[in-house]
């Protein structure tokens, strides 16, 4: 692809983003494919090249990013407003060799394995919702990884002491702030379908003012 861009004269006019939807365990923890909470199943490549921002070419940024940052980044590159419903942040300050005014201090991912267990449990919902407990969420900071399971179990790894994710901690002074951070993240990123839509007396409602197409639609 890169050769084709160079041969066609588009290399200096094309933004390139190389990433993936998941990683691969490749034998780590005795496992393969993508399963569980381990970072090696979720830590993916992220390479972004803006041909206009040569000052940052070749730079390695050691900060947390997530796939939700891709769309805001592309919008910002194209001088388009970032949709209000986007959960991510634009990477454009890093691409210009600058520090953004705000950035996340942790990465998050979730894993849901209900589909693999559908044949195991009888369909006795709503009284016994076994499948609803077959998921997990991870809050990964610079020093720790907190794993919350939907059935109430949890794990907390001290990855500063042991980057291989084999050393657990149960220290409340460590675990409680991580659980609070996990809850805050979930609350801030809950489903926002129709959020910000005001139903008014006698009318169908209106969207918030920062939705780009609102003024064009109402005119």
Give the role of each language-model region.
Residues 162:
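Acidic carboxylate motifs that coordinate Ca2+ or other divalent cations, activating on Asp/Glu
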